[in-house]
């Protein structure tokens, strides 16, 4: 993977059209594994995750670790959508909490609100929604 870093002026320029800009630092991991790094970073922080990429049941080249999530979006048995903040912040970039009462529409609304810069030399996930969707 090529080394990708943005200058301050590039970050400011990207911020005019995107709400999320990945800040990248490449570190040598030595004997660390994705799980050992996750355990050190997550340390009982709610909403943390370790997502391993895999192709055809075989480990692939990326491990994604998320810590200090913004919040949790759920839909109860009656169909009402609920946002539970982990950071005392709204789910939307404009600061509002007016989410659609349709679960999938609320997910789309949050995703659209937090546009992410796509960088060719980075893994396909630099930020975004991570979770589980179930239905009956």
Task: List PLM regions with ranges.
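Signature of the chorismate-utilizing enzyme
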Residues: 1-136
């Amino acid at each position: 993977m090529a080394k990708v870093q943005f200058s301050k002026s590039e970050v400011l320029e990207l911020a005019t059209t995107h709400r999320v800009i990945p800040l990248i630092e490449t570190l040598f991991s030595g004997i660390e594994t994705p799980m050992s790094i996750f355990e050190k970073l997550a340390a009982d922080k709610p909403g943390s995750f370790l997502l391993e990429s895999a192709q055809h049941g075989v480990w692939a080249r990326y491990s994604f670790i998320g810590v200090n999530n913004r919040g949790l979006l759920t839909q109860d048995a009656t169909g009402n959508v609920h946002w539970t903040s982990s950071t005392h912040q709204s789910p939307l970039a404009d600061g509002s909490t007016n989410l659609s009462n349709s679960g999938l529409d609320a997910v789309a609304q949050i995703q659209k609100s937090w546009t992410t810069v796509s960088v060719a030399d980075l893994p396909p996930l630099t930020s975004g929604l991570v979770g589980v969707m179930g239905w009956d």
